[in-house]
Amino acid sequence: MVEALLAGELRRRGVEATVHSAGLLFDGRAADPHSVSAMADRELDLSGFASRKMTESLLRSADLVIGMERRHVREAAVALPEVWPRAFTLKELARRASAAGPRPDDVPVEDWLARLAADRTTTDHLGDDPSDDVPDPIGRSLRTFRRCAEDLERLVGVVVEHLWPASPSTDAVPSNDAVRSTTA
């Protein structure tokens, strides 16, 4: 759901970016029917979605890696250690972005993310933590998926509002920004 929400919000703001989703478990699985419904409520289409596994190549090409849980960020950092400064859980990224304030137009995304990550250590992501983890709605009711989608939409809004606060321009937003959303 985050891939669709993030891509939709970036499109709405006129930000040119490539957004991909990758997970830890499955390749080729369709989106859960409840995910499809929750996104259809927002006029976002998941009908053609197929899951894919996170790979070193995908991580290497991403300017930002967003995990739904700490374990996703840990696995990304284990697969490719240099991804650590640009890998966050969605909740962590929204929290750190809110604390830091909007990215100035003259500061590249990579530099702004490095500032957000400056005081972190890899041990910060040991174990699970509800303050960082988005509960996985798989196997739950449509109502649970809709509540999850509301939370994700709010968090994505915070992230985009801080990463791309100004009207986009070719100088402020490189068209090759790539964002990877990692889910289980």
Please report, for each region that a protein language model flagged, where it lies by residue.
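Short polar/charged helix/loop
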Residues: 1-184
